[in-house]
Amino acid sequence: MAVDSLETEIDTAVRVVHLASSLCVKVQEKLHLPNGGHVKSKDDDSPVTVADFGVQAIVSWVLAEVFGDQNLSIVAEEDTETLSEADSLGLLGAVSNAVNEALSEAQNYGLPKPVKPLGSSEILKAISRCNSVGGPKGRHWVLDPVDGTLGFVRGDQYAVALALIENGKVLLGVLGCPNYPVKKECLSNGCNQAMKTKAVAGSVSKGCVMYAKRGSGQAWMQPLIVGGIPESATLLKVSSVDDPVLATVCEPVERANSNHLFTAGLANSMGVRKQPMRVYSMVKYAAIARGDAEVFMKFAQSSYKEKIWDHAAGVVIVEEAGGVVTDAGGRNLDFSKGVYLEGLDRGIIACSGQVLHEKIIGAVYASWESSSL
């Protein structure tokens, strides 16, 4: 399918991420209330919340309504195993309430609305629909309902990430960043300071939604409005900084997800002076796309396998905003191998431009042999 024919897809994706992000805002407000959290641990001890399941159900249901569910392929992080456990009735009830509350406002976002509230079985079906494993052929929607759930639980940064892949190529991406400030100047007080403002229905939130379509040469940002869609968008452009000394480097917060020691040594070898911008989730890609940072580096432990839903949406947004994203060997990320980014060379490097990217790649090769990664 030609990229030019994706108007319905990008429009639907942007709208449903706005709706899903609004659900997240409301759920996060309740997290620290008595009995308002419903945070559980999955088999790998990572947290999962009402928002994770609620977003996946909403996105799945909307995509099925708009595009039909017969040949709909959705690759997503969550399944229904946790919700099906005997002690999860309260969690399932909270998910159902959140989903139906959000879908009751779907028409405000220009999206279809259920004739009647969805039952638990319908919500579980919607979540279970997202069981595709992707691959080199065909069209696959790729969803991370709440990327950075730990950040979400802590009242910090997180993202709703939706992408469309066809024949192994990412065609579009949308990032909902409910706690990432629309105005850059808010970052001067630190990323985490922008999250204390309560979102009010019908008003501009502190967050934003970013999106891009492959080949357009443009990436866009809209303010996140709880209860509707904004009427305008702002063009995104990466930073023009190409000197590592002046660059801001993004990296994951959790040491388990990245080798901070190696990235610190790498930054030092290039003369980087600024402290790293440590951010949960794909908000790191948002920071690069908007020019708030120039470099995102992630070097996970060798046993860790990167998943496509953690990168697809962010990669296309950065690239269409003028940036470059590759593995540490300078190769494009391969989204055609299924759930995982197979064949990844050491790590992932996203930069605001080709000149800076080449300098980073060169420094990686120079530093690699002396690292303990």
Swiss-Prot record:
Q: Gene3D superfamilies from the entry?
A: 3.40.190.80, Fructose-1,6-Bisphosphatase, subunit A, domain 1
Q: Does the keyword tRNA processing apply?
A: no
The protein's annotated catalytic reaction(s) are: adenosine 3',5'-bisphosphate + H2O = AMP + phosphate; 3'-phosphoadenylyl sulfate + H2O = adenosine 5'-phosphosulfate + phosphate
* Reported regulation of activity: Inhibited by Li(+) (IC(50)=10 mM), Na(+) (IC(50)=50 mM) and Ca(2+) (IC(50)=0.06 mM).
Tissues and organs where the protein is expressed, per its UniProt entry: Expressed in roots, leaves, stems, flowers and siliques.
One GO biological process term is: phosphatidylinositol phosphate biosynthetic process
Molecular function (GO) terms for this protein are: 3'(2'),5'-bisphosphate nucleotidase activity; metal ion binding
KW Metal-binding (keyword) present:
yes
Q: Which InterPro entries match?
A: DPNP (IPR006239), Inositol_monoP_metal-BS (IPR020583), Inositol_monoP_superfamily (IPR051090), Inositol_monophosphatase-like (IPR000760), Inositol_monophosphatase_CS (IPR020550)
Q: Kindly give the Pfam families that the UniProt entry links to this protein.
A: Inositol_P
Which residues does the record give as Mg(2+) 2 binding sites?
A: D144, D147, D310
The record's EC number reads 3.1.3.7
Superkingdom, taxonomy of origin: Eukaryota
What's the cofactor?
A: Mg(2+)
The annotated active site, in chain numbering, is D52, T149
Task: Give binding positions for AMP.
Answer: S281, K284, K298, D310
Chain positions recorded as adenosine 3',5'-bisphosphate binding sites: T149, S281, K284, K298, D310
Q: Name the positions where Mg(2+) 3 binds.
A: E77
UniProt record similarity statement: Belongs to the inositol monophosphatase superfamily.
Query: Which NCBIfam families does the record cross-reference, listed alphabetically?
Result: bisphos_HAL2 (TIGR01330)
Q: What does this protein do?
A: Phosphatase that converts adenosine 3'-phosphate 5'-phosphosulfate (PAPS) to adenosine 5'-phosphosulfate (APS) and 3'-phosphoadenosine 5'-phosphate (3'-PAP) to AMP. May regulate the flux of sulfur in the sulfur-activation pathway by converting PAPS to APS. Prevents both the toxicity of PAP on RNA processing enzymes as well as the product inhibition by PAP of sulfate conjugation.
What else is on record for this protein? Substrate preference is 3'-phosphoadenosine 5'-phosphate (3'-PAP) > adenosine 3'-phosphate 5'-phosphosulfate (PAPS). No activity observed against 2'-PAP, 3' or 5'-AMP, inositol mono and diphosphates and fructose-1,6-bisphosphate.
Protein name (record): 3',5'-bisphosphate nucleotidase AHL
What's the source species for this entry?
Arabidopsis thaliana (Mouse-ear cress)
